[in-house]
Amino acid sequence: IAKNGEQATEAWGKSLVKNLARKPQGNDRAQIIAVASGEADIAVANSYYIGIMLSGTAGEEQREAAKKVQMIFPNQQGKGTHVNISGAGILKYAPNPNNANLFLEFLLSDKVQKHMVSKSYEYPIVNVAVSKEMSGFGLDFKEDNTSVKVYGEMNPDAIRLMDRAGWK
């Protein structure tokens, strides 16, 4: 809504609903499995779930399903791909902001970031290598720079818009 306006976003939402291969169900991995099995041609899923599936930690069946799909980063010619964040911060009235800051610095250290990306299959915030499962998808993609603050501000409007579009 913030980037394209309410009218264009609602038209997009209606097209999305009209093109669903099935009623929305399951989690991200269920969407990936639906594509792998031929039930759908395309799905929206967080990239780290494909990493988890490819790692084999979720079982051989999920690994094989993930091998059958291709991940793409949409909107590369436009605004870029939406990126979720896993974040941490210091509350305004934190009783010990100095230690909280030290903890944040620890979380941003190469050692911790390497551990996190190798276990979560997320992309790192600092310049450390991504997991081998994720490296095959590429690192050079355009990210949407919309502030996460906007998501919260626009959330009620987005929910009403998707209700009008017929999302279930």
Language-model features, listed with the residues they occupy:
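Structured segments of extracytoplasmic/periplasmic soluble domains
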Residues: 3, 19, 34, 38, ...
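Soluble non-cytosolic domains of exported or imported proteins
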Residues: 7, 26-29, 44, 93-98, ...
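Solvent-exposed, polar/charged alpha-helical surfaces in well-ordered, non-transmembrane soluble domains
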Residues: 14, 33, 37, 101-105, ...
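A short, terminal or domain-edge coil/loop segment
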Residues: 34-47, 62-66, 83-85, 122-134, ...
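Flexible, solvent-exposed loop/hinge segments that line or gate ligand/substrate-binding clefts
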Residues: 64-96
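Mature extracytoplasmic/periplasmic domains
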Residues: 86-145
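Extracellular/periplasmic bilobal clamshell ligand-binding domains
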Residues: 130-168
